[in-house]
């Protein structure tokens, strides 16, 4: 007798860990940069360059890209951009890690502070967070039937249907988007870009035949110095569509996507945004090269009939079992919540207008409850304002806006795998009377919840002649009174009788029994 087996291809997170570390650096201004009068804006971004798994540890090498905008009193531009990167190398202890493991590392800046030591020297302090995950592709070979020899003769076996989520496609790729953004005619030509921010909104992925459709929005903000004697400071903000397709061999419309994405940053922590001439040779076009780093997982749900148990009627059939684990999609959920807040500005000068606002959604705490996945965190908000101060008209303020939200996922447990992706879908900051900021935001959260299903898998079976003493010890006829948990299968196994025979003998319509129910068993019936 041989088992018919089916291979099931799946993935799981083997282990994960989070570390924090600090970076501090005193930075001297390059000779070609004018003296600092006051600091205005700063931001930091983690750029991961290399991930090296080892024994019980992972080495991560990367850079902290920074951009600092400051005021100067020297002749020329009123605002100056200073950008660069600080290298780092960190070891993350992860017990059980092997050099052959596949490790994914995400880096975020928890806090980035710039202090002015003097007009030519700055102190940079940053708190960085690294999240490492060992992702494992694994296969389970499970029995789905029996064949050969005396299969089916004197043998009872139980087949149970199970919903399984198989991994169909697993790969990393990059989706690139090039766009030329012309300035409106009312805007002056660009001399140099002082500050920029590129962010993604409403990004979606849809499987198609042999390709993956990408759609969403790209929000672009630039603060620039205009051409001309006055060198005026202007800002421009726009939203452009993100759409296109990515070749994906084996992709089909019915597959379920779980795709993690991030915007590829340059060394200084920003996407590439350049000044380009228009057809008249004037510097009026912003050239954007946007790249999305994609971690692609495409799944397929399938119902598979699995051989769960087997016993012999005329012989001993002994199953050899092992522990196995299957993956099952519990839910693909997207939820949105509105966040509103009022914040008093602490700028020091009367504010004339809010020029630009940007934010990052952080998840500080994630907890599984009866209602679903409870999330707590904040919007790390940066607001650029124009003030009445003619010497330093541009001032920024940073705020943390708290939120709490529960993703409604029925039946989720703490042992289930659920990585939540957060996104700032909408952000609006208005200036109220009394130097107060009115903040309105829409946050979007999405997750794919995978349930782990442990089971005993039959690896093989051993056939032996049945002990004659066992058969002799069975009664010729007996009225069996069902105990809690009994069914026709457990009774048939105990008395070496076919389930169908017991069912027909007792005129039963199902194999389920209620406690105390009487079942007639007659030895020798087949």
Residue positions per predicted region:
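Extracellular LysM carbohydrate-binding repeats and other cell-envelope/extracellular binding modules
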Residues: 497-526
């Amino acid at each position: 007798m041989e088992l018919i087996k089916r291979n099931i291809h799946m993935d799981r997170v083997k282990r994960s860990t989070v570390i924090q570390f600090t970076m501090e650096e005193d930075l001297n201004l390059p000779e070609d940069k004018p003296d600092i009068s006051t600091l205005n804006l700063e931001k930091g971004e983690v750029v991961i360059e290399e991930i090296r798994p080892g024994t019980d540890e992972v080495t991560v090498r990367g850079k902290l890209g920074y951009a600092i905008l400051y005021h100067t009193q020297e002749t020329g531009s009123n605002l100056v951009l200073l950008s660069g990167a600080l290298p780092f190398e960190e070891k993350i202890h992860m017990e059980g890690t092997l050099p052959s493991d596949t490790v994914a590392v995400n880096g975020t800046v928890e806090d980035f502070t710039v202090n002015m030591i003097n007009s030519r020297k700055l102190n940079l302090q940053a708190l960085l967070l690294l999240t490492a995950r060992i992702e494992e592709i694994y296969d389970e070979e499970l029995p789905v039937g029996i064949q050969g020899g005396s299969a089916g003769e004197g043998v009872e076996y139980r087949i149970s249907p199970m919903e399984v989520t198989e991994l169909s496609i697993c790969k990393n790729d990059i989706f690139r988007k090039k766009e030329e953004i012309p300035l409106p005619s009312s805007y002056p030509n660009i001399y140099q870009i002082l500050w920029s921010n590129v962010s993604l909104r409403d990004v979606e992925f849809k499987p198609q035949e042999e390709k993956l459709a990408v759609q969403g929005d790209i929000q672009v903000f630039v603060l620039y110095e205009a051409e001309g004697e006055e060198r005026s400071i202007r800002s421009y903000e726009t939203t452009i569509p993100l759409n296109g397709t990515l070749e994906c061999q084996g992709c089909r419309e019915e597959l379920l996507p779980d795709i993690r994405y991030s915007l590829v940053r340059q060394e200084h922590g920003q996407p590439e945004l350049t000044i380009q001439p228009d057809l008249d040779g004037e510097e009026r076009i912003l050239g954007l090269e946007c790249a999305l780093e994609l971690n692609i997982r495409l799944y397929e749900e399938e119902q598979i009939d699995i051989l769960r148990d087997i016993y012999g009627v005329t012989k001993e059939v002994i199953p050899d079992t092992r522990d196995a684990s299957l993956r099952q999609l519990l839910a693909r959920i997207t939820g949105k919540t509105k966040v509103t807040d009022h914040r008093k500005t602490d700028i020091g000068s009367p504010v004339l207008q809010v020029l630009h606002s940007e934010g990052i959604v952080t998840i500080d705490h994630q907890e599984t409850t009866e209602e679903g996945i409870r999330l707590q965190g904040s919007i790390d908000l940066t607001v650029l304002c124009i003030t009445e101060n003619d010497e330093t008209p541009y001032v920024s303020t940073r705020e943390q806006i708290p939120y709490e939200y529960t993703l409604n996922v029925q039946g989720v447990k703490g042992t289930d795998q659920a990585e939540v992706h957060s996104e700032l879908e909408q952000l609006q900051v208005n200036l109220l009377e009394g130097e107060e900021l009115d903040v309105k935001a829409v946050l979007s959260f999405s997750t794919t919840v995978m349930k782990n299903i442990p089971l005993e898998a039959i690896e093989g079976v051993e056939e032996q002649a049945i002990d004659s003493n066992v058969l002799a010890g069975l009664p010729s006829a007996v009225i069996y009174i069902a105990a809690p948990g009994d069914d026709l299968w457990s009774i048939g196994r105990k008395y070496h009788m076919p389930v169908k025979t017991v069912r027909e003998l007792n005129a039963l319509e199902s194999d389920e029994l209620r406690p105390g129910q009487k079942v007639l068993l007659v030895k020798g019936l087949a």
